[in-house]
Swiss-Prot record:
Keywords: Cytoplasm, DNA-binding, Transcription, Transcription regulation. The lineage of its organism: Bacteria, Bacillati, Cyanobacteriota, Cyanophyceae, Gomontiellales. This is Probable transcriptional regulatory protein Cyan7425_4347. Pfam families: TACO1_YebC_N, Transcrip_reg. Transmembrane segments: none annotated. Belongs to the TACO1 family.
Length: 254
């Protein structure tokens, strides 16, 4: 029986992983469709599309899927549901501000799904503009940590970057470089020309001020809310203005 139970657990875990992977593929494919629809369906002349394709390839999406998404966006595969980009805003437990970017072909469905997730985890979906002023949109380029930081700084100055941060990840140290959204393509182009392989180039919302969470129960519920929102099919990204310190995070995981 123990073996059977373990096999059942493994199957459930694999199903969760497969579902998560499928959701990521769908999310990235939608981004390609919208990028191709908004501009020309040629990545060489469409930076948004080029960035979406690079992100999709990094996630392991097959080339056939990518080409099909581009063709859909260009209208070459017949009638397709019109996807639109919508920004939603709301509050988590304790008044934490949350900003959600979605792509949907049904606003009513998306709003209902978001409202249900907020309500389940102690938050509420707000009106447009209720928390948007608490965030700025910036351009962010991600690369592997540079070996020569002094030379790297010179390149950043030339490219018009604002700031950068070194971040430890499971795959090693990366550098996240922040710039104005309007300068994102130029920054990515300069970095590539100077032989810094760009892992990701995207616009992102960042909180102007962060709220430090001190209550472990509030922290747990906020993280559950973020997970629930990110798991929704129509959601592309979720940004919040709270931070959890390492000590509290350790306490929460015990």
């Amino acid at each position: 029986m123990a073996g059977h139970s373990k096999w059942a657990n493994i199957k459930r875990q694999k199903a969760r992983v497969d579902a998560k992977k499928g959701a990521v593929f769908a999310r990235l494919s939608r981004a390609i469709i919208v990028a191709a629809r908004h501009g020309i369906p040629d990545p060489e002349g469409n930076f948004q599309l080029r960035s979406a394709i690079e992100k999709a390839k990094a996630a392991g999406i097959p080339n056939d899927n990518i080409e099909r998404a581009i063709a859909k966006g260009a209208g070459k595969l017949g009638a397709d549901s019109e996807l639109e980009e919508i920004r939603y805003e709301g509050y988590g437990l304790g008044g934490v501000a949350i900003l959600i970017e979605a792509m949907t072909d049904n606003r009513n469905r998306t709003a209902a799904d978001l409202r249900a997730a907020f309500n389940k985890h102690g938050g509420n979906l707000g009106e447009t503009g209720c928390v948007g002023w608490m965030f700025n949109q910036v351009g962010i380029v991600t690369i592997a940590a540079p070996a020569d930081e002094e030379a790297f700084l010179e390149v950043l100055l030339e490219a018009g970057a604002d700031t950068y941060e070194l971040i430890e990840t499971e795959e090693g140290t990366i550098a996240e470089i922040v710039t104005e959204v309007t300068n994102l393509e130029h920054l990515a182009t300069v970095l590539k020309a100077q032989h810094y392989p760009v892992r990701e180039a995207e616009s992102r919302w960042v909180a102007i001020n962060m709220v430090e969470i001190s209550d472990p129960e509030q922290g747990r519920r906020l993280l559950k809310l973020m997970d629930a929102l990110e798991d929704l099919d129509d959601v592309q990204s979720v940004t919040a203005n709270f931070a959890i310190g390492d000590n509290l995070l350790t306490e929460m995981l015990v």
